[in-house]
């Protein structure tokens, strides 16, 4: 996004990042970030803390001309609230790469709301992670974590199982 001249404002659970951003906050800063965003890109895990974090109240905080892009997990957004917001606000747009009912291989895709009937929605089949070099990057990160472990250091990116249990 920076290549397009974007100023990056981010929130996460810690309020810290090693990434180059103009602002980093915690989930307590989410309302402020939503109100200022021209483009909101969701790329966070679905945990107890993030399930349904974007609902009607949060969508109303956003600019009427904002673009919401979800490349994370569908459950982060209230499906009905997003559909109604898109329907009622034609200048608000969404790029949706992850869906609320993702079918097992060979089964039909379905939605509870007719998103594809809206002119302000662009959908893709949950394949945004498939980009050139992504598997090599993942393999490199895994190898670096093995190296850390073998040296007696803590691996990077450790998650707490209890944050995900009973999602």
Language-model segments: which ranges?
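Rossmann-like adenosine-cofactor binding region
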Residues: 14-111
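Rossmann-like dinucleotide-binding domain for NAD(H)/NADP(H)
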Residues: 65, 72-167
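Glycine-rich NAD(P)-binding loop of Rossmann-like domains
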Residues: 5, 23, 164
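Generic signal for short, ordered secondary-structure residues
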Residues: 12-13, 41, 121, 125
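Surface-exposed amphipathic alpha-helices with a cationic face
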Residues: 1-2
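General small-molecule cofactor/ligand-binding pocket signal
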Residues: 9, 25, 122
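N-terminal Rossmann-fold cofactor-binding loop
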Residues: 5, 10-15
